[in-house]
């Protein structure tokens, strides 16, 4: 495919080629150039004609450089074509020299710069120099829109796609492949070779994210195209291997020509190893090493040799040769890391800017850590796990979309668990050291990393140019979110395809903007910095009566870390599966209790107290304010609903103030408690007087916001448009409305506003739209709608809920509901919350006191089903100083007059 694009290159550049030096020498060089150029453009070129063309261009370049004709158009174009011929012949090192020579002459023609950057970026990719490839390709991408150069744009996007796939970002890679294929299909002449190559790449990106059947369907359609059949065979084998159908994988691998693709020997070795045939595995591995430079037209590069060593390490490990396995995996690390060269099994890379194939390097580091662990060399295992996790965080931060980041987290959580287990074992062997703190920090660094990274970027205060780019990034995130929402209800395949193409284009532009931002050194430091608060930092954020309680579920154990001002304690709760079943049973009881029904916690409540509450109480040392960082299913549990003692006669809410965090890292830098903010609440009650669309009336919602200072929107005025226009004008936002949370499709979760005449999407605020907003000026959002804390549970990231979306957007804290709420009970609790908040209480204490007021009232229903659904997540501090409460007294009288103490009639929200 490489030579086909060169004809289009001639159309762009050769009109100015004849502007070479004048006189007899110049005429002679032009004649020689034209002779070489005619050979260069032959429809059926051969090695001989390419060799003659290369000699001609080389002679022209040498004479012009000798004559000092720097920057001459004839010189730069001849040098470029020399590079292209070397590139096509597989001489990437000399091709790179030629391309860099062109750029070194600083040609004035931007189209020549664009084309050369595409080629030099591609040749750096072929040399496995991924950082340099990325540098030139991204520079070319910034110029691509200025030229109608389809073929080189296809080459650009295809190479960028391959680059991202090789670094594990398969979703972004597919975006580029799809974009390139769209360009090919839109051309006046259809380039079959290019189209087939791109479809192979698209299928490969698909099976790498688990879409095996989709990938195989594409490959089967391409089997008839003979020139690339070996690549189809290879990738079909890899897809079957991904499905763990190793006999079928081997059948396809055996069809591949070793002369064309010698690297397939690695995949054959791996398949044999999975089939427990170690002798065959060793034979294939050694066969690839024997081929080496004699592999014919197929290239064996550092990536192939690294993979060979990686598979070899596992084969040696299975034979019991751990020393040999460590030696081989270290060789793989050296090859994958690029600029790292340490032969001993104790060296680990500390920086990753020169590495390529990040996910391969990550796998190799994990393998090495596991080998050290198996040998009980725990210090070496811990050091290697630390390097692997640093790389993992680097990879995650390099991804442009949260979808890609969450995919990575779902597939790498086990490594954090293994590292934590090693650290805890080291603490057991060496008590009094810092291993317990390191174990705690391993868990905390894994939690809410997507939210944390976004908030750090939002808080970036750099140059005005960088801040402007950040604004564009937010805009594109919002556009992508809107497209995700639009796609949810689309059934027409052509419309869905159009939305998909638009989204892919926006994601490519989002990535380009983020790479442009990374040119700002301070922004790069903020984005990729791996620092996180230590124990002393967190202790400085805690009050004397506070305990930070962090849960980490892994390996059949619930690890409970309790941080107070005077220390760090760890409790391991065994039988995690039983504990999780009890939590789920407790939640079912909370959601199922009917009006007037007596809540019966029974044996489940007793077990939860003994296994969960009591150990925390003991580790907290009598402290009565807990800041809980949950994990897994525990993120859905309102701890205040649990028993406070073994008798079950007291709820935890009666003894303990509780709030929640997505990560302890979000404690640092929070606004100081007690510092007053501007007064006023932005409140919405779209269904106070009447229902609309599919949503029923919520009569108590109007009373819920009645008398609040600030701006109130009721019924038909409570629109999504008004919310977006006014959301950052008040420190508190109160949404008394309906909401829908999806447990298996986060994109379908939304908050309902009053339906206008527009499309449904214009009347609902979807979860992904919230991701694109900047809500940093907002200190508290109260969402009294039901189930706004529900969603898919992603280990170490939390519940993908509407409440999390507000935190992601920068809101300081949220009060949300975990299940279908009683309308009247919710209204009273929130009225009392405002009353305590205006007296200067912290948000956490105000919510606790409001629930206690409810329990002391004459309400009929006092089970936790009616008050435990409301939970506070985020900054728990006060919004108002205690001296600023006088104004609120007047407001409180107005609230009482408008709403009074309501009767408790059962009205559930949907």
State the predicted function of each range.
Residues 18-80:
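N-terminal leader/linker segments that initiate helical-solenoid repeat arrays
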Residues 40-45, 77-88, 114-126, 152-166, ...:
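Conserved alpha-helical positions within TPR/SEL1-like repeat arrays
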Residues 58-65, 100-105, 139-145, 179-188, ...:
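Amphipathic alpha-helical segments of tetratricopeptide repeats
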Residues 528-910:
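Catalytic cores of enzymes
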Residues 326, 330, 334-337, 341, ...:
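Amphipathic alpha-helical protein-protein interaction segments
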Residues 27, 70-74, 112, 152, ...:
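Structural signature of alpha-solenoid helical repeat junctions
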